[in-house]
């Protein structure tokens, strides 16, 4: 389970990250990352977007659990000021957790290369 301090819950955070953040697409997910300029951040925050295009409620919930698990695995690689939104694509309903984690790591690495950020 993703700790509460690392969960993105406000729609304004989601909106800012998606609209102003750097995007990297993978076959099963699209990842957006934005560096926050707030200095009192408790750590990186991660949000999930799993739309009805992914499948029915059971499938969406399964994908959400897998993505949360993958996000937890990469949490220590993120900077405390990072805001990350993971958008699940319809193909993600058939993806296993290790594949989602690998795609998340690949997407974050591509974003790092584009922005020139050290971490």
Swiss-Prot record:
Q: Which UniProt keywords apply?
A: Endonuclease, Hydrolase, Nuclease, RNA-binding, tRNA processing
Q: Which SUPFAM superfamilies match?
A: Ribosomal protein S5 domain 2-like
- Cross-referenced Gene3D superfamilies: 3.30.230.10
Q: Which branch of life, at top level?
A: Bacteria
The family line of this record is: Belongs to the RnpA family.
Q: Give the record's subunit note.
A: Consists of a catalytic RNA component (M1 or rnpB) and a protein subunit.
Task: From the Swiss-Prot or TrEMBL record, give the protein name.
Answer: Ribonuclease P protein component
* Native species: Mycolicibacterium vanbaalenii (strain DSM 7251 / JCM 13017 / BCRC 16820 / KCTC 9966 / NRRL B-24157 / PYR-1) (Mycobacterium vanbaalenii)
Query: Taxonomic classification, please?
Result: Bacteria, Bacillati, Actinomycetota, Actinomycetes, Mycobacteriales
């Amino acid at each position: 389970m993703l700790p509460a301090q690392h969960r993105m819950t406000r729609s304004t955070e989601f909106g800012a990250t998606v609209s102003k953040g750097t995007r990297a697409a993978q076959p099963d997910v699209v990842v957006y990352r934005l560096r926050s300029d707030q200095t009192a951040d408790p750590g990186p925050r991660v949000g999930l977007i799993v739309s009805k295009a992914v499948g029915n409620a059971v499938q969406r919930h399964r994908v959400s659990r897998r993505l949360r698990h993958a996000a937890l695995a990469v949490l220590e690689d993120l900077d405390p000021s990072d805001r990350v939104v993971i958008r699940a694509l319809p193909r993600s309903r058939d993806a296993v957790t290790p594949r989602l984690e690998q795609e998340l790591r690949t997407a974050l690495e591509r974003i790092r290369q584009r922005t020139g950020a050290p971490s």
